[in-house]
């Protein structure tokens, strides 16, 4: 089959590479740099497995900035472009997705359009009506940044928001490229699939918020947070995973997906969803105040990325603490080797790690890394288990 993949971020790239094992795939992106990298079998994002796959596997894969030429004669067109959360409208900005749908329908009306971008509940029904077509389906992704291809090769489940032959075919294409056997396939209605994505990420955010609030309680009471978490997590109903305290949940998906789900509730009574959103801000305020109590003159921010093995700066939790410290007049220095500029939010960006270490009084690091072992006394982190 011929498949077009529009948007070559974590989701689009991992899907394009997986599907190119057994199909002709053309990736589309507005970034010429990303297109050139993919055509040269280089990954434009940090993902070790993806880089290895591109180097070692025989893939029927090419990339282009020309959308119309790329989707011509395609059987499926996957849209995986960003849907940023608009704080003014309290909804995802789906304008880019809608623009691509419009262009694909005009160029290749026979293609089945599969939305992989995260969308609000009811979006598929809305665009089917506005574009007067049923050729649009939704298949949510459940990928981790930095491990997107691995999560496609070993998926927890494949969900498609339609009970139809074309939905089964698409799910089969994803399963065909995966290494995992006996993958759970789930075919639902469109709104159910949209809700599955938002509720999944909101549950993960809730778990992060829960263990962060446990950690805040332990810090305030000067008791052993690690011992409490270990004791709680030994209950098999709770589990010893996704329980490492942090500066808050961050990254591209969890902050915006929780807010979108809250907006989707509208007039439906709820308490937990609002509490999850609010808890993330409360955690950052609490930790910022702890740091301020130390009366530092200069605070260092070690990496802006969301987590180890990621190159994503978007909505990383450490930025929330950084902004709160700056609002109190604290001088901040940022160490971020992936940042190609000299300042970040009016703070100096230091590219020399040695200079960075001796310049600041306290180093904030969401996750502890070996690079900071020689200055452990300076490091402020809530990483208790050495994992994400």
Kindly give the residue locations of the regions a language model identified.
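Structural/interface elements that position substrates and couple domains in central-metabolism enzymes
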Residues: 1-388
């Amino acid at each position: 089959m011929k498949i077009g993949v529009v948007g070559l971020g974590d989701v689009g790239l991992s899907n394009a590479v997986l599907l190119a094992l057994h199909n002709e795939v053309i990736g589309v992106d507005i970034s010429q740099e990303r297109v050139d990298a993919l055509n040269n079998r280089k990954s434009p994002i940090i993902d070790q497995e993806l880089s290895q796959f591109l180097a070692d596997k025989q893939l029927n894969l090419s990339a282009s900035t020309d959308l119309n030429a790329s989707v011509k004669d395609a059987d499926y067109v996957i849209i995986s472009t960003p849907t940023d959360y608009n704080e003014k409208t309290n909804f995802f900005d789906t304008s880019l997705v809608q623009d691509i749908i419009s262009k694909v329908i005009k160029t290749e009306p026979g293609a089945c359009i599969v939305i992989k971008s995260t969308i609000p509940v009811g979006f598929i029904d809305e665009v089917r009506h506005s574009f007067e077509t049923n050729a649009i389906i939704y298949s949510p992704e459940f990928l981790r940044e930095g491990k997107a291809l691995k999560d496609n090769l070993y998926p927890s489940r494949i969900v498609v928001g339609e009970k139809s032959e074309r939905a089964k075919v698409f799910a089969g294409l994803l399963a065909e490229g995966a290494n995992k056997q006996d993958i759970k396939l789930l075919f639902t209605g469109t709104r159910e699939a949209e809700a599955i994505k938002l509720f999944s990420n909101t549950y993960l955010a809730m778990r992060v918020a829960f263990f962060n609030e446990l950690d805040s309680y332990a810090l305030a009471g000067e008791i052993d947070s690690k011992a409490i978490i270990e004791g709680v997590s030994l209950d098999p109903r709770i589990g010893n995973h996704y329980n490492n305290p942090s500066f808050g949940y961050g990254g591209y998906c969890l902050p915006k997906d929780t807010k979108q789900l809250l907006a989707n509730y509208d007039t439906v009574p709820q308490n937990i969803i609002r509490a999850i959103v609010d808890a993330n801000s409360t955690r950052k305020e609490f930790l910022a105040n702890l740091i301020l109590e130390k009366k530092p003159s200069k605070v260092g921010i070690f990496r802006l990325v969301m987590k180890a093995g990621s190159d994503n700066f978007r909505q990383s939790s450490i930025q929330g603490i950084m902004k709160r410290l700056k609002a109190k007049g604290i001088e901040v220095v940022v160490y971020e080797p992936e940042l190609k500029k000299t300042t970040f939010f009016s703070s100096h960006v230091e590219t020399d790690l040695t200079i960075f270490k001796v310049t600041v009084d306290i180093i904030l690091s969401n996750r502890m890394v070996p690079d900071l072992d020689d200055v452990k006394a300076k490091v402020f982190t809530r990483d208790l288990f050495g994992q994400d």
